């Protein structure tokens, strides 16, 4: 699904373009907004094409500061010009701005916009590891896993985060010295709240901007593989936060969450549960699992909060849940 939805560079009639597509089945209208059009929902309307999907294409130069050097003469203009959201009109006429569920990059919190980002072009150096992995038998091989949270493992003296690059420089020799065969990263997907440690995901396809760019996370995993260390990622397919820019009531109706709060709400966590019975949601989640394995060369996923997906009475009082 991530190959069709989200923002992707394409070529049309010899011209470089960016193609945007979003699933919002019950929306009355959808517009693409961003720094490129002053966040004006009237400037870039999207067209509804099929199965509740909306799309639009724009020339790649639209997102280049060279298109108007005088207008974009301010700090970080090049990066800000890549930001975008979908402005979605619900059936009741109200509008809301949403980050791209399939966006490959997002702004650093507290900002919440998605960013166009071309994931292609990274030159992996872990071919030997990937080939050896095909015949690796974890059931008959020693496994020693180091679980860690990138944001709290180590920091600069002033309390700021290390970058993906800095983590790679320090983590690889540490794991080798301590004899670990694998490292398990707590969620590296984008999330709005530091205190959640990444377990309330807002950008399922976006490597968190706290530590750098997506390709720098690729380089971290690449360095680990070249050192003979496997990489496991914590993955959170059970629930998602209620932040206004996220998946909650995405087009004004429950799209990703179950419409019945007895299935769709997790009272203890203050989050929504995914509606696994919906094909589009299944596609979103299964595609996401494949995405991290394929694009980031992750060696496996540790699935979080499985009990909450299997036991509908988990952390719920009588009357707050429905039986199977």
What kind of feature is each model-predicted range?
Residues 107, 127-143, 149-324:
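Substrate-binding/active-site clefts of carbohydrate-active enzymes
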Residues 9-11, 36, 60, 189, ...:
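Short, well-ordered turn and helix-capping elements at secondary-structure junctions
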Residues 43-47:
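Beta-strand-rich interaction surfaces with strong enrichment in secreted/lumenal proteins
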Residues 30-32, 84:
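Short beta-strand elements bearing conserved aromatic residues within extracellular beta-rich modules
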Residues 1-19, 48-147, 152-159, 166:
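The feature marks proteins involved in alpha-glucan
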Residues 23-30, 39:
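Short proline/glycine-enriched turn/loop motifs at strand-loop junctions of beta-rich domains
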């Amino acid at each position: 699904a991530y190959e069709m939805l989200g923002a992707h560079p394409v070529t049309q009639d010899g011209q470089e373009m960016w193609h945007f597509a979003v699933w919002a089945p019950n929306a009355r209208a959808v517009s693409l907004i961003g720094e490129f059009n002053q966040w004006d929902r009237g400037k870039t309307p999207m067209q509804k094409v099929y199965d509740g999907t909306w799309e639009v294409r724009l020339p790649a130069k639209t997102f280049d500061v060279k298109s108007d050097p005088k207008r974009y003469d301010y700090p970080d203009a090049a990066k800000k010009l890549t930001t975008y959201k979908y402005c979605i009109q619900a059936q009741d006429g109200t509008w809301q701005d949403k980050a791209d569920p399939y966006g490959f990059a997002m702004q650093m919190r507290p900002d919440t916009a998605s960013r166009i980002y071309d994931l292609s072009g990274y030159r992996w150096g872990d071919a030997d590891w990937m080939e050896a992995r095909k015949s690796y038998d974890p059931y008959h091989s020693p496994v020693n896993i180091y679980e860690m949270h990138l944001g709290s493992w180590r920091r600069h003296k002033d309390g700021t985060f290390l970058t993906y690059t800095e983590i790679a420089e320090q983590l690889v020799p540490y794991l080798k010295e301590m004899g670990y065969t694998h490292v398990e990263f707590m969620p590296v997907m984008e999330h709005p709240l530091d205190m959640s440690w990444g377990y309330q995901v807002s950008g399922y396809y976006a490597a968190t901007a706290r530590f750098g760019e997506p390709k720098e996370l690729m380089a971290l995993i690449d360095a680990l593989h070249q050192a003979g260390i496997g990489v496991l990622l914590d993955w959170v397919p059970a629930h998602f936060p209620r932040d206004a820019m996220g998946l909650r009531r995405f087009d004004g109706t429950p799209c990703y969450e179950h419409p019945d709060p007895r299935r769709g709400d997790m009272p203890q966590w203050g989050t929504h549960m995914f509606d696994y019975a919906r094909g589009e949601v299944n596609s979103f989640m299964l595609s996401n699992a494949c995405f991290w394995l394929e694009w980031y060369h992750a060696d496996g996923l540790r699935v979080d909060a499985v009990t909450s997906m299997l036991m509908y009475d988990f952390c719920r009082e009588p009357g707050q849940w429905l039986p199977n």
